[in-house]
Amino acid sequence: LELQPSGGVSPGGWYTEILAPYLMNNGLLIAAHFNPKESKWRSNMRKKFEKRIQDYPYFRKIKMSVLSMPPIKLTSDNSVDMVLTFRNLHNWLKSGYLEEVFQVSYNALKVGGIFGVVEHRAPKTFSIEEMIKSGYVSESYVIEVAKKVGFKLIERSEINANPLDDKEHENGVWTLLPTLKLNDAGLRKKYIDIGESDRMTMKFIKNK
């Protein structure tokens, strides 16, 4: 189950393009996308993603679900092997629903199921307010919330790390690729050279 595969970039589904072909003949990918009954922007994002399902052969077996705000049941309890989220945590933190999203993810997983997280990584010193403003979230905070709902951290990786990202950007993580929200166009090359954000990659388990 992939949470909000839009990734904030219309029509979304970058990671879905990896997951869907992999699971097409031996598994099922559930995409928990925006609620079509919410804002026009969210509804349009979902419609564009649904159109991709029709247009892209590897997407056609994807089952659609809803990740609404506040979060609702994603699918049947104790029914999926894995829940994945890519660069969404800062949005849920800003909306005030981060813990609830973790809880419905926990509920959806079978015992022994995996919760995988990729997120822009904040320095340990960042406050909640700094995380919300910058779009970066600290590993310690993610672990704290995950443990609170019942998850256990079992592994982390530096595969998505970027030591060039010092996290000190005027427009937060959105200053970097792929957004490049710049107040000074002369800084474009500087931020292209930095690349995308430094990211945590963590693996949790539902062990009971």
Residue spans for each PLM region:
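Conserved beta-strand signature within the Rossmann-like core of class I S-adenosyl-L-methionine
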Residues: 28-32, 112-120
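A conserved beta-strand element that flanks and buttresses the S-adenosyl-L-methionine
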Residues: 84-88
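Short alpha-helix
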Residues: 135-156
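Core SAM-dependent methyltransferase catalytic element
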Residues: 166-208
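A short, conserved alpha-helix within the catalytic core of class I
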Residues: 69, 91-104
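A short glycine-rich, Lys/Arg-flanked "PGG" loop and its adjoining helix->strand segment in the class I
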Residues: 20-24, 98-111
